[in-house]
Amino acid sequence: VKRAIFLGESLKWPTDGQEIPLKVRQIFTGPNIPRPQVALAPHLARQLLLDRPNGSTLACTLDGETQRFALDRLHHHLLPLRSQNVRDGAILIVENRTGEVLAYGSDSGEPASGRFVDGVQAKRQAGSALKPFLYALAFDERILTPASQLDDSPLDVAVFGGLYHPRNYESQFQGLVPVRVALASSLNVPAVRALSLVGTEAFLNRLRHLGIKALDESADFYGPALALGSADVSLWELVNAYRTLANGGEWSELRLTFEKTPLSPRKKVFSPQAAFMISDILSDREARSITFGLENPLATRFWAAAKTGTSKDMRDNWCIGYSPKYTVGVWVGNFSGEPMWNVSGISGAAPVWVEVMNWLPRNGAPARREPPPRLVREKIIFSHGSVSPREEWFIQGTESVLLEDKGGSYHQRILYPPPGTVFALDPDIPRDLQKIFFTMQTPQKAVRWVLNGSELPSLGKATPWTPKAGKYHLALMDGEGQTLDSVHFEVRGASVDPPQEEGEALVQGE
């Protein structure tokens, strides 16, 4: 009051010593008293009230306790990631049956700019988070089963303007792997091979049916990289797509308000059988152990299916998953688009996801899902012996109890280098520090490397070799001198030694 009177007098405004205290009292004791508080869902409020008159009141589906817990856990896990150039994140929690949104929010380390960015609706590259929908389509089209074998070895795909070289996150290859392992462990090369079987156009159309709206380019534009999530999606779209799997393959709109409108009709995107098999794979700790280990942030105290994703250059990482009752999605990255420093979905988004998911069923853990009709479970045997016999789910009519390796000694194949590879020596790096690793699939018997006719010291699946300029023939041979596999490759670049010609003896091992 004193400040207001002083300001009025200094500006020579007519002031009433009685009127100003009265007005101040009305402001701070009336029904519109300004209360210092943190808005729980500012982005959602802005979205819902955008086209409504001032003073509107609208009841939304958010659960206050769930919203507070989700935002608190998101903020808590983002703090230690600041040292790895991670500032922002978003979380979305929905109820599967009704589609009601229970938590919706973002957290930003840059409040001045982050408050204007809705992390739930922002478009980001999906990374590996799209793979479950690719394999679900392959199951429905009877192209693949969870037991089908896919080749995880170096692959060069011709695309417009050159070659596309998909690589796994760990830059290692596993050879022949079942689809179950390929999806659960998020192997990239098998996903690209699966896309070539399904067709990019068919996969693109299925993603559109899942409500992913930014896919307005042609199949040729996305190419084989679509299998690895080159498309832009929002957390909102991705969570609802995973909710579709939780609901047996049926998609419907998410619900933000309790207005007198019926639940949106459901449309069938995948069969219940395909949705169940994908869910079973995404909840399989053993199948994901190749990449993530048996104990990892995706392991919940009850049945839940989950998938991570990391976009190119580590600009975005995701963890999306569901129990029979809830679907939870977490995005971690930077609203500015800057890359993170060595942060993947398993280390960035997954810890938030698993803590929230474990907290949600606080009134009792959900029961495991029951298989739908027309699914059968058969014991399968892999003839090449690299995978132990196990039981697997099949859609009736697709089962096969013996999966043969038609390539004979295919499991002995050289994984790296691929045939015809041309390596370039780097003149700025000392030659003895440059290495090429010869790798093979896990052998079933004693094998040896032979380079240009001379045996190399073998160090197991991967043998390092110091390259020099020349042309080479690399063979993988058994103890009886039979060639199991061979490749030709070339090394180019500055070298103090004369170029090596194919056929000359050269032994270099580390």
Regions found by a protein language model. Give the residues of each.
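Soluble, non-transmembrane domains of envelope/secretory-pathway proteins that act on or interact
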Residues: V24-L40, P154, A158, A304-E510
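A short, well-structured edge-of-sheet supersecondary motif
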Residues: I20-V24, Q84-S113, N205-L210
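A structural microfeature
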Residues: L102-A103, S148, P457, D485
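Second-shell loop/turn segments in exported
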Residues: K2-P14, P31-R35, N54-T61, P80-L81, ...
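Non-catalytic, structured segments within soluble enzyme domains
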Residues: V1-R68, D72, N205-D220, P224-G229, ...
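A penicillin-recognizing enzyme superfamily signal
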Residues: C60-S83, I91, E95, Y104, ...
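Active-site SXXK
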Residues: V1-E9, A70, G99, V120-D152, ...
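Conserved catalytic neighborhood of penicillin-recognizing serine enzymes
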Residues: A4, S10, I33-L50, R97, ...
